[in-house]
Regions:
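Hydrophobic-ligand binding "helix-grip"
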Residues: 58-129
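Intrinsic-disorder/low-complexity coil detector
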Residues: 20, 42, 74, 78, ...
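Hydrophobic ligand-binding cavity/cleft-lining segments
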Residues: 1-64
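Generic hydrophobic/packing signal
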Residues: 36, 42, 63, 86, ...
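Hydrophobic pocket/interface hotspot
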Residues: 47-48, 57, 88, 119, ...
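Amphipathic alpha-helical interface surfaces
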Residues: 53, 57, 84, 134-137, ...
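Terminal "cap-and-tail" regions of soluble proteins that handle hydrophobic small molecules
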Residues: 1-29, 116-118, 122-168
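Residue-level detector of solvent-exposed, low-hydrophobicity positions
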Residues: 23, 43, 47, 55, ...
Length: 168
């Protein structure tokens, strides 16, 4: 766990993701997956809505357009400043969402135990060389979701600590 200071004078605890071996292999070498866990003292439906409802996504991630499982997200802040294509591959609300983002595979699972909702995010099929660049991006987006759910100021990418060396 690391502490990061935001541009608003806030201190937020940020959980690192893990780089794990991927079962699949690429033609040019090893693949890894990025695995993240977060826990929220909120009902699963509240966390699910924050991560899937267009109106809520617009408050912490960016504007969402499109339909029928093919969406475009225009990020409001972050490492990617262009519109991002998202295709929903599988959705079992409020527990599982599998999407393809610009050709990449992302799995999100949510489980509620008592008053705590656990969120597991897995970004699959990452080349080991790209993990250092991609890892901090998903950590940052999860930190924005966390800040949104906790009614805290959203972290800004420009103020975000560089964490590339933590994703090897």
């Amino acid at each position: 766990m690391t502490t990061s200071g935001g541009g608003h004078g806030m201190t937020m605890m940020s959980m690192l993701g893990e780089v794990r071996p991927e079962h699949d292999r690429a033609a040019d070498g090893e693949l890894v997956l990025l695995h993240y866990l977060r826990s929220f003292r909120k009902p699963v439906l509240e966390v699910w809505s924050a991560a899937t409802d267009r109106g809520q996504l617009a408050r912490w991630l960016g504007a969402v357009s499109g339909g029928s499982g093919n969406l475009t997200i225009e990020p409001m802040d972050g490492p990617v400043s262009r519109p991002v294509a998202v295709r929903v591959g599988h959705c079992q609300a409020p527990h599982e969402l599998i999407v393809h983002i610009d050709g990449c595979l992302l799995e999100i699972r949510m489980t509620q135990v008592g008053v705590v909702t656990n969120v597991e995010l897995v970004r699959r099929h990452v080349s080991a060389a790209d993990a250092r660049e991609i890892g901090p991006r998903w950590q940052y987006l999860l930190d924005r979701l966390t800040a949104y759910l906790d009614y805290q100021p959203l972290p800004q990418w420009a103020d975000y600590p560089k964490r590339e060396d933590e994703y090897r």
